[in-house]
UniProtKB/Swiss-Prot annotation:
PANTHER family: L-FUCOSE-PROTON SYMPORTER, PROTEIN TSGA
Alphabetical keyword list: Cell inner membrane, Cell membrane, Membrane, Transmembrane, Transmembrane helix
Any one GO molecular-function label of the UniProt entry: transmembrane transporter activity
UniProt cross-references to InterPro entries, sorted A to Z: MFS, MFS_dom, MFS_trans_sf, MFS_TsgA, MFS_TsgA-like
GO cellular component term, pick one: plasma membrane
Pfam families: MFS_1
Name of this protein: Protein TsgA
Disulfide bonds: none
Chain ranges passing through the membrane: 11-31, 51-71, 78-98, 101-121, 134-154, 162-182, 206-226, 245-265, 273-293, 297-317, 332-352, 361-381
Bilayer topology term: Multi-pass membrane protein
Localization: Cell inner membrane
Family statement: Belongs to the major facilitator superfamily. TsgA family.
Length: 393
C-alpha cells in the first residue's frame, strides 16, 4: 500500500467518526426547532430520533457481513447517494413519517461509514500503533460534537431553518466521497485475492465476551451519567448555565485526553492500562456523585480525561484477539457499544422517575465498576500479547 493511499484511507476513517459525532450530538440543539416545525411537543419529537440510533445500530451489525459481499468503495459511494436523498427529504418534506425515514437513512449511512472507518484503522495499523490511531480517530467524534453544535447555534440564531444544519453535516460526507476517488481499499471475502493456503477459522475466545460486555456497560454508563448531570446539578442549586458548563468541560477534557493517550498508549500494555483507567474512572465518578458542588468541576474534568481512552482501547483489544483483524469481531464489539446508546433512556428514565437523577448517576457508576471487573478478568484470557509478538517478528 502506498503512503498517499494510506493517508487517504486514514482521513476517510477520521471523517467517518466526525460524521457520526455530528449527527448524534447535534440532536439536542435542533430538537426544539424541529418540534416547532412539526407543531409537536419536544417530548414526542425526541422519540423520532430513535430512528437515527436504530439506523446506526442495524447498519453496524449488518455491515459485518456486507463488508465481505459489497466492496468498501461501493458502499461509501452508495452512502453518498443515500445521504443526498436523506438531506433532500428533510428539506422538502413536511411529513413526520418522511422525517423519521430520513433520520433512519442518516443513521444507516453513518453506521456503515463508521464501521468501515474502524475496520480500515484496524487493518492498516498493528499492535500498539493501532490503539493510538483508533484513539485519534475517535477524537474526531468529539471534535465534531464541539464544532457542529456551534454551527447549529450560529444558523438557528439567524433564523435559518434547522435542516441547513444537516446540509452542513452532509458536507463531511462530500469530503469522504471525494477521497474515494483514486484510492484503493482492502478487498474482503469473495473480492480478496485468492491464496492456496486454507482459510483458518479462528475462534474468538471468552476475551471477546468480556470486551463486549465492557463496551455495552461503558457506553450505557457514560451516556446515562452525562445525560442526567445537568438535572442533578440543578437539584444541588446550580444554575442551568453552570450545569451546562459541567457537560462542556467533560467533553473538552475527553477530547484532550484522547489526544494525550494516542501518544501515551504506545508505551504500555493495553489490557493493563485499560484496567487502571477503568478503575480510576469508576472512582472519579463516585467522587463526583457523592462530593460537594465545590469539587464537581474538578472531578468531572478528571473523569473526562481519564475515561477518554477506555472505549477505543476496548475496540483495539477486541481486534487483537485474532491473528488477522476480523471485521465481524470489530463490528460485534461496536454493536454492543451502540446497544448501550440505544438503552440509555430506556434504563435511566424509569430510575430517574422513581428515585431521582442521583440514582441514575450511581447506576452509571455501577456500570463503570462492571467495566473495571471485565477488564481485570480479561487479563487472564486475552490473546493480544501473543498476537502482538507474532506481528513484531
Amino acid at each position: 500500500m502506498t503512503n498517499s493511499n494510506r493517508i487517504k484511507l486514514t482521513w476517510i476513517s477520521f471523517l467517518s467518526y466526525a460524521l457520526t459525532g455530528a449527527l448524534v450530538i447535534v440532536t439536542g440543539m435542533v430538537m426544539g426547532n424541529i418540534a416547532d416545525y412539526f407543531n409537536l411537543p419536544v417530548s414526542s419529537m425526541s422519540n423520532t430520533f430513535t430512528f437515527l440510533n436504530a439506523g446506526i445500530l442495524i447498519s453496524i451489525f449488518l455491515n459485518a457481513w456486507l463488508m465481505e459481499i459489497v466492496p468498501l468503495k461501493t458502499q461509501l459511494r452508495f452512502g453518498f447517494l443515500l445521504m443526498v436523498l436523506a438531506v433532500a427529504g428533510l428539506m422538502f418534506s413536511h411529513s413526520l413519517a418522511l422525517f423519521s425515514a430520513a433520520m433512519f437513512i442518516l443513521g444507516v449511512v453513518s453506521g456503515i461509514t463508521m464501521s468501515i472507518g474502524t475496520f480500515l484503522v484496524t487493518q492498516m495499523y498493528e499492535g500498539r500503533q493501532r490503539g493510538s490511531r483508533l484513539l485519534f480517530t475517535d477524537s474526531f467524534f468529539s471534535m465534531a460534537g464541539m464544532i457542529f453544535p456551534m454551527i447549529a447555534a450560529f444558523l438557528l440564531a439567524r433564523s435559518i431553518e434547522w435542516y441547513w444544519v444537516y446540509a452542513c453535516i452532509g458536507l463531511v460526507y462530500v469530503a469522504i466521497f471525494i477521497l474515494t476517488f483514486g484510492c484503493e481499499f482492502p478487498a474482503l471475502g469473495k473480492h480478496a485475492p485468492k491464496t492456496d493456503a486454507p482459510v483458518e477459522k479462528e475462534k474468538w475466545g471468552i476475551g471477546v465476551l468480556f470486551l463486549s460486555v465492557a463496551a455495552l456497560c461503558y457506553i450505557l454508563g457514560q451516556l446515562g451519567f452525562i445525560s442526567w448531570v445537568p438535572e442533578y446539578a440543578k437539584g444541588l442549586g446550580m444554575s442551568l448555565n453552570d450545569a451546562g458548563t459541567l457537560v462542556s468541560n467533560f467533553w473538552m477534557s475527553y477530547m484532550v485526553g484522547m489526544w494525550a493517550f494516542s501518544f501515551i498508549l504506545r508505551f504500555f500494555d493495553l489490557q493493563r492500562i485499560l484496567t487502571v483507567l477503568a478503575g480510576l474512572a469508576a472512582i472519579l465518578m463516585y467522587v463526583f456523585n457523592t462530593g460537594t458542588p465545590a469539587y464537581m468541576a474538578w472531578s468531572i474534568l478528571a473523569l473526562g480525561f481519564f475515561s477518554s481512552a477506555i472505549y477505543t482501547t476496548i475496540i483495539t483489544l477486541g481486534s487483537q484477539q485474532t491473528k488477522v483483524p476480523s471485521p465481524k469481531l470489530v463490528n460485534f464489539v461496536l454493536t454492543c457499544g451502540t446497544i448501550g446508546t440505544m438503552l440509555t433512556f430506556v434504563v435511566t428514565g424509569p430510575i430517574v422517575e422513581h428515585s431521582g437523577p442521583q440514582a441514575a448517576l450511581l447506576t452509571a457508576n455501577g456500570l463503570y465498576a462492571v467495566v473495571f471487573v471485565m477488564c481485570f478478568l480479561l487479563g487472564f484470557v486475552s490473546r493480544h500479547r501473543q498476537h502482538n509478538t507474532l506481528t513484531s517478528h
